[in-house]
């Protein structure tokens, strides 16, 4: 009998947490990684590791910007965001979170040893507190402030 792959076991547990938490994004992402791992597609892991985050951020940015591009948010609404205090505060928070995310990407790139903890924490946050799986970048950014790395 072949020994069970511990990495596969971890992925299965994380997929289970995704299912329990009813988070299809996490579940589908992990099941996709399992499929890649157990098929000849596993040769693409280096490429996925190198470009996956960038592609994910690109897709997320497209999703966030679509209401402006489609006209659902008009040009006048965008311009008004610079004069209303709540919108100005939203801009400041957006800048801060983007900055933290940038620090997070840098930390995750230069200190891969923290990635596992950040991922487990994010999946637990999604599973137990109905969070969303954008947490690793922001969490890594906050961690970089605590440990003094960028």
From Swiss-Prot:
Keyword vocabulary terms for this entry: Cell membrane, Membrane, Transmembrane, Transmembrane helix
Kindly indicate whether the keyword GTP-binding belongs to this entry: no
Q: Where in the cell is it found?
A: Cell membrane
The record gives the membrane topology as: Multi-pass membrane protein
GO cellular component terms, alphabetically, are:
plasma membrane
Residues spanning the membrane: 1-21, 51-71, 88-108, 114-134
Q: Report the leader peptide range.
A: none
The principal location of this protein is membrane
Please give the InterPro entries that the UniProt record associates with this protein: UPF0756_TM (IPR007382)
Residue stretches in coiled coil: none
Similarity comment text for this entry: Belongs to the UPF0756 family.
Q: What's the protein name?
A: UPF0756 membrane protein YE1142
